[in-house]
Amino acid sequence: MREGIHPKYNEVTVKCLCGNTFQTRSTKPEISTEICSACHPFFTGKQKLVDTAGRVERFKKRYGM
């Protein structure tokens, strides 16, 4: 590899809106994110059930089912 053409690869802190922080490596000095594995519903197991009954009824009404 040629020297002087690659960006510096440093340890950085990733900060989530939920308050969770963790270390990783990146060429950016700081990383902010809205959702991380500590607060994402898929990883926490606290998935919200979406009530789709209104959508189903509207579909049936629209297409005469």
UniProtKB/Swiss-Prot annotation:
Keywords: Metal-binding, Ribonucleoprotein, Ribosomal protein, RNA-binding, rRNA-binding, Zinc. Signal peptide: none annotated. The keyword rRNA-binding applies. Binds 1 zinc ion per subunit. It holds the Pfam family Ribosomal_L31. GO terms for cellular component: ribonucleoprotein complex; ribosome. GO terms for biological process: translation. It comes from the Bacteria. PROSITE patterns: RIBOSOMAL_L31. Zn(2+) binds at residues 16, 18, 36, 39. Part of the 50S ribosomal subunit. Binds the 23S rRNA. This is Large ribosomal subunit protein bL31. It comes from Geotalea daltonii (strain DSM 22248 / JCM 15807 / FRC-32) (Geobacter daltonii).
